Amino acid sequence: MKTLCYIVLFFGATTSLAQQTLEQVLLKYNKQSIPYISAEMLIDIKNDPTIVLLDSREKKEYEVSHIKGALYAGYEDFNLQEVSKNIKSIDTPIIVYCSLGVRSEDIAETLQKAGYTNIKNLYGGIFNWKNNNLPVVNRQQKPTDSVHVYSKKWGKWLTKGIKVNNK
């Protein structure tokens, strides 16, 4: 009986360790070098014409869905000169997002190193946005429930919407 209790305790502890929170994932993969903005805060300011919203995922992810008004910035093929054409000044408010907020921190750091001073990273990325029942659009700018999940590992963080992974 004791052995059974130890086995149950061991597997219970192992399972709970495997269940990370979003905050723990972001602490693990990010340097916290760029301040976050919540989905709720972004809703309040999203229609401000001075804000530049950048999607730092790959093109195939962006084409499945993105936050309406977001400009494609990319990650592997990020081009600072191209993106800078859409940013009026170094203090323009810039919000960068990706799937969860990891790649977007990298792109935001690149923008920061280039001299931009008003950059935020969308906390939880497009997954958290969609999980909060907020709208996304496809490449035709039509509302969709589909979201590219990047990989099976990251896809577990999308709890609402249709998971797409066309790798």
Predicted regions and their residues:
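Residue-level detector of alpha-helix initiation sites
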Residues: G101-V102
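Bacterial Sec-dependent N-terminal signal peptides
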Residues: M1-Q24
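A general structural motif
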Residues: P49-I51, D91-P93
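Short hydrophobic beta-strand that contains or immediately precedes a catalytic carboxylate
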Residues: L42, T50-R57, A70
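Rhodanese-like catalytic fold shared by cysteine-dependent sulfurtransferases
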Residues: Q19-I37, E63-T92, E105-K167
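Short, surface-exposed ligand- or partner-binding patches at beta-edge/loop junctions that are enriched
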Residues: Y97
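N-terminal signal-anchor transmembrane helix
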Residues: I37-I43
